[in-house]
């Protein structure tokens, strides 16, 4: 850890010098007060475009531009109509009708029909954990007429609108029926949505640039914007995503007016940016995000729960958070819970993660570990994740594991993590990721705590008990019973360990004062942002 602290100090000093230097020779390049293009730097490169195929947040953010949703969640946590004008449910709770509002068209000019939405819901429900719970009780996804989606159920599903309005990744975005009929394990072939921006295929260059242009035919709602709900007004004719993996380069571009908005600056650079009167810093997601070690429970060595428990014993959350987010305690906290802290189902089990290397070594020995290779895949171009892989590799070596640390770019990682083969055939043992507190707040939406096996999220933890508890939570008659079930699931997962929490953090976004209207929420929403 001391070496990492020295590297951090050297990095801060060197970067500060680089960022300060231009100001000594020339003033920052001023961006015009009114501009036709918003220039944005996302958290990572965009390699997969289909928001149903992948849970990568950057893909979900991209999808907010191109596609739209029937329902979305506001800051109060309540799902509200978006493409829908409203919904009705039969007295027995088994027949839902969702009505489409006026003016909905896909980017090719074809009207959005109920059958497009029914097919989109059906595809999403095969892939996403909350949707899979819904899918088990669905008789049919269909349409009563061109403007009315009809979902017939085998039994009531009171949280249907919450499922359709989930706010994080794997959101049920609506697509034309012909695209929605694509195998959910394969990427759709075109980006034809009904959202406020159109994807410019000819200018897409993964690793460099993504371009969107305003959808002039989009009809916004009349309500004020609130997270993913309300009026999605596209104030810029053109938005460019600039992929800049080097933080110092991104910071300099922001200071010099070469970009307008940097989604996720690294904490080391926040003090430098805070001194620039032309830049605003703001918390982007008030509930925060939970960072985790994700195990491949399908293959050795972490198919053995005893080895996963040994790793948990060695985890020191402070090491992870300080390595990634520095010493500013307003940016992170420890969180000894399998559900994010600050959410209704938070538990506090610090004894489960004592950071005790001796105990971890003993646990490995008792489990009969004999040097099986542990492959960690770690993204070099994702600052909110990369340092955590270094901490884990260091810790595993210290407790006696045979570590093969493989650094790759994020785009490669999100594809490689789908490999279920053993490590000697290109598989993996560990990667690191994070999820929003709201997006992982309950058993239905939290894909990393679910035990769906091959049908579940990367890592493929299989647990009939976890799945039954998720179903029991969904069927519970009241909030008190739901909390008891969620607590049982959390404690069970802490023992079985599909993942290990390494801390919760609160990122800041940075933008030039030449733009305004940037909203907090679950994504860097493009609507409402406008020239100042």
Protein language model features and the residues they cover:
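Periplasmic-binding protein-like
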Residues: 298, 302-342, 387-388, 493-503
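Long beta-strand-rich cores associated with HINT superfamily self-processing modules
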Residues: 511-532
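Surface-exposed binding/hinge segments that line
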Residues: 133-180, 185-205
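Ligand-site clamp/hinge motif
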Residues: 220-272, 402
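N-terminal lobe/hinge region of extracytoplasmic solute-binding protein
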Residues: 41-91, 122, 192
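Ligand/substrate-recognition segments at binding pockets and active sites
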Residues: 208, 246-247, 265, 343, ...
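Extracytoplasmic/peripheral linker and loop segments enriched in polar/acidic and small residues
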Residues: 399, 404-415, 443-513, 532
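Structural transition elements
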Residues: 197, 330-366, 380-387
